[in-house]
């Protein structure tokens, strides 16, 4: 398995991984599958500030993970939300864990200290993976998203890195 930075050429593979999450699950609250050009736009926007990684096995992209802004205020500059998606046929093979490890390491190198995951529940596999990685549940929002003719809850999980906070200037220099 190779974990590498995303390329715009990966957009079609990423869309193929994401499509069943949109059309078959409430794991994402997105209801329409984005186009390849939309994924290219999202990749470009994410890479302007955050890491975006893919897992490749035998030349095929089987998963991806990226970070995004938790909230657009300066006081949150040490906090980021992580997202991960693994192809159906590749789940349970360690791809998600490898992606998360690489993403967390990159984020720490850039000065981020708080990692958040927003998880639609029920999703025992995602919650177990996050707990194994040191995340704890910090919030539960009942009936907050409506998809497939029913309401769905979300939970927020957080992992805290106990490093000293750098000045904003030091953090910006690492990014």
Predicted ranges, named:
Residues 91, 117-127:
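Conserved beta-strand-loop-alpha-helix junction that forms the acyl-donor binding cleft
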Residues 92-105, 128-132:
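Conserved acetyl-CoA-binding loop-helix of GNAT-fold acetyltransferases
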Residues 31-89, 100-101, 160-162:
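Acetyl-CoA-dependent GNAT
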Residues 66-69, 116-119, 131, 136-153, ...:
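Conserved catalytic-core motifs of GNAT/GCN5-like acyltransferases
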Residues 18, 59, 130, 135, ...:
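Conserved active-site tyrosine of GNAT-family acetyltransferases
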